Amino acid sequence: SRIAAQEFPGLPICLYGHSMGGGIAACAAAQDPRLYSRLILSSPMIRPNTAPTPWPLACLVAKVFCMAGGEERYLPGNHPYDGTEQYADSASASQCRFLYYQEKRSKEPLFQMNAASYGWLWQSHRLNRNLQKKAWRRISCPTRIFQAENETYVSKKEQERFVKKLCRRKRIDAKLIRVKGSKHEMLNSDPKTLEAYWDKI
């Protein structure tokens, strides 16, 4: 972002982040608040969804594993990419887009995402703590958080809590936008939903 500001002086810099990238984008906007003119967070991971395991317990277990040197071990039920994900179990609301990206992912190792580890969960805890305790106080640009209606990957309550904190600062234009019919991967929605999503952005 700093390089973009140097190469294109005078132009507004809009920061967009999705999922875990949304949480990271929020931290970036807090770290250098005067750099950004807009912040757009799509299904942001303010905190991952660990249900049915309570969040405090999940963090405690992750900390113990990390202290014991097991940060690279996968969480229960998680495994490396194997290309067998089914549409019915996915975070996509459009089967056509799901199949399109699944084919691309199968051919390019760099697109193949692995599952969550104990180390990842512990770092997610640190991210959540930073966002809810410090970062929200420093964000100064207009912010839009897009929340999926059928979200299962990240905590909707934490998204709402984060927006409420931003709104406490009267000079901040922060809004939560609920996207009907969508799942976590909003870019894999049906054409009508996706068009409305991009129009609002």
Predicted feature descriptions by range:
Residues K164-E185:
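Catalytic histidine neighborhood in serine/cysteine hydrolases
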Residues I139, I145-Q147:
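Short beta-strand/loop motif that positions the catalytic acidic residue
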Residues G17-G22, A148:
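Conserved alpha/beta-hydrolase "nucleophile elbow" surrounding the catalytic nucleophile
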Residues S182-E195:
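Catalytic histidine-centered segment of alpha/beta-hydrolase-like enzymes
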Residues S1-L11:
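Conserved acidic catalytic loop of the alpha/beta-hydrolase fold
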Residues C141, S155-K165:
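Short alpha-helix in the alpha/beta-hydrolase fold that links the catalytic acid
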Residues N150-V154:
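Acidic catalytic loop of the alpha/beta-hydrolase fold
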Residues M20, A25-Q112:
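Alpha/beta-hydrolase-fold enzymes
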